[in-house]
């Protein structure tokens, strides 16, 4: 009997040491859990910082686009002012033309008077013939100038055709850009749907946060794309209209002026040499102005190409920044998912260890009750003194949650020196089922964990970021009090009073 008691005490000591060891393991797991919680909070803070950087990049992009648009409007205003100056010069030249025509009429009247005087001035006939020869020579020069103007007109037409080809190429590039944009939008929508499908299996709080971020990025891309396309189409239409009006005006003006000047020169060649010379100078001036206008058109085309290149570069930089921020967000989400998985594994390990602890507590309580039952059955107090009782038999039956059964006895014959010791026929066996710990408190919104006392651990701490308003449920388990009733069944032999 004493050996069985000693073995029971040694078993209790071993279980106590195991319990201390499990307690240390639980403390280590709690420390790891706190570290994971801190890491999650830091990652959420970094996520908030990345969102702020994304907003800053968007504001910078919008500011740059407004600046380029403002510069383009200023250049457009300058060009319109120059066009008004050209139109003003055209009106002035028209007035000069009218004045020249009036002078021409006066000269014709004077020529008529001179013809009347020719009959009386036969001495000046040879001089007049020389003057006519000179005028014919100048007329040939005027014809050469006309041919030069016609060649210049052909060159201008070729340049106009080239400009139309460039406009057509710009239209084709614009259509290709729209097709590529539509393809990218379709790919982006496909990726968003895949991301939405994967996101539905995650935690409720992460799903809401991802959906808000996805909607924000989608609205941002669609808004910037629509704004870019509308501005590009409007600018191309305005530039095309201005170029067409300018080219038509210059072409009509050059053709009208050249033809009118040539007719005037041919009519006045026999009348006035000085007038022909002045008209030739005016034609030369008009040719120079045509060259100046052509140079101005070239400069405008170059400025348009530079503005288009700047817009393309700004759009490319914006797309690169958005892709970089999206990649960082995906990395943070993957890291959060990995940490959540580790947290789930750690929680399961914590629960398993807690189950083992409860099982050890139940087994220790069972052994304590067995020991106290043996002491009561043997009639011993806490100090091991045997209490004398009248000889007799005692039987007892019982049942409990452990289902233990056993029989045995101890007898002593008073009238002889022989002591008979009867051992148990079978050692009592005890079966137990560990009672699982259940979270105490209200129901969690996530469906996985239940907060303690109706309030989560994250709710009792300040949420990171301050503006997200997100809370995370942390599994906190509370041990339930285990109540058990121990009843032993067995048969005791006759007792002997010492």
Curated annotation (Swiss-Prot):
Belongs to the intermediate filament family. It is found in: Cytoplasm; Cytoplasm, Cell cortex. Residues 393-409 have a biased composition (Gly residues). Intermediate filament (IF) protein that forms both short filaments and extensive cytoskeletal networks which most likely are homomeric. Some of the cytotardin arrays display cage-like perinuclear structures, while others are located in the periphery close to the cell membrane. The entire tardigrade body is ensheathed by a grid of belt-like filaments formed by the cytotardin protein, which retain their integrity even in contracted specimens. InterPro entries: IF_rod_dom. GO terms for molecular function: structural constituent of cytoskeleton. Residues 18-58 are annotated as: Coil 1A. Its main location: cytoplasm. The keyword Lyase does not apply. Keywords: Coiled coil, Cytoplasm, Intermediate filament, Stress response. This is Cytotardin. Pfam families: Filament. Residues 232-371 are annotated as: Coil 2. The keyword rRNA-binding does not apply. Residues 22-378 form the IF rod domain. It comes from the Eukaryota. One of its GO terms (biological process) is nuclear pore localization. Residues 381-425 are annotated as: Disordered. Contains an alpha-helical IF rod domain organization with three coiled coil-forming segments (coil 1A, coil 1B, and coil 2). The lineage of its organism: Eukaryota, Metazoa, Ecdysozoa, Tardigrada, Eutardigrada. Residues 214-231 are annotated as: Linker 2.
């Amino acid at each position: 009997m004493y050996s069985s008691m000693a073995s029971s005490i040694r078993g209790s000591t071993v279980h106590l040491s195991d319990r201390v060891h499990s307690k240390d393991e639980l403390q280590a797991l709690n420390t790891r859990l706190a570290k994971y919680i801190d890491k999650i909070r830091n990652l959420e803070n970094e996520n908030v910082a990345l969102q702020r950087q994304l907003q800053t990049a968007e504001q910078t992009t919008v500011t740059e686009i407004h600046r380029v648009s403002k510069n383009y409007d200023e250049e457009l205003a300058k060009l319109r002012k120059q066009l008004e100056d050209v139109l003003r010069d055209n009106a002035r030249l028209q007035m000069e033309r009218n004045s020249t025509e009036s002078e021409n009429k006066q000269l014709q009247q004077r020529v008529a008077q001179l013809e009347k005087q020719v009959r009386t001035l036969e001495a000046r006939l040879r001089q007049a013939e020389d003057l006519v020869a000179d005028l014919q020579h100048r007329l040939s020069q005027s014809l050469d100038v006309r041919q030069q103007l016609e060649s210049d007109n052909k060159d201008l037409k070729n340049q106009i055709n080239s400009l139309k080809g460039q406009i057509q190429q710009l239209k084709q590039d614009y259509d290709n850009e729209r097709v590529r944009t539509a393809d990218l939008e379709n790919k982006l929508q496909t990726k968003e749907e895949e991301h939405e499908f994967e996101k539905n299996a995650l935690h409720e709080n992460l799903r809401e946060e991802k959906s808000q971020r996805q909607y924000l990025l989608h609205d941002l891309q669609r808004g910037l794309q629509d704004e870019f396309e509308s501005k590009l189409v409007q600018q191309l239409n305005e530039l095309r209209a201005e170029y067409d009006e300018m080219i038509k005006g210059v072409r009509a003006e050059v053709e009208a002026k050249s033809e009118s000047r040539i007719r005037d020169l041919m009519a006045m060649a026999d009348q006035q040499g000085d007038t022909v010379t002045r008209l030739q100078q005016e034609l030369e001036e008009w040719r120079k102005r045509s060259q100046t206008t052509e140079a101005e058109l070239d400069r405008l085309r170059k400025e348009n190409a530079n503005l288009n290149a700047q817009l393309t570069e700004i759009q490319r930089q914006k797309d690169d920044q958005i892709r970089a921020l999206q990649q960082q967000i995906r990395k943070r989400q993957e890291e959060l998912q990995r940490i959540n998985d580790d947290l789930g594994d750690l929680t399961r390990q914590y629960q398993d260890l807690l189950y083992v602890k409860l099982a050890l507590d139940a087994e220790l309580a069972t052994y304590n009750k067995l020991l106290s039952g043996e002491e009561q059955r043997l009639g011993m107090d806490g100090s091991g003194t045997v209490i004398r009782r009248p000889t007799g038999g005692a039987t007892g039956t019982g049942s409990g949650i452990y289902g233990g059964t056993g029989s045995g006895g101890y007898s002593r014959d008073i009238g002889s020196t022989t002591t008979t010791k009867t051992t148990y026929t079978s050692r009592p066996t005890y079966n137990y089922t560990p009672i699982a710990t259940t979270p105490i408190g209200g129901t969690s919104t996530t469906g996985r964990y239940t907060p303690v006392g109706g309030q989560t651990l994250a709710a009792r701490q300040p949420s990171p970021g301050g503006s997200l308003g997100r809370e995370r449920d942390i599994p906190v388990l509370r041990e339930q009090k285990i109540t058990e009733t121990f009843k032993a069944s067995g048969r005791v032999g006759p007792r002997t009073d010492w």
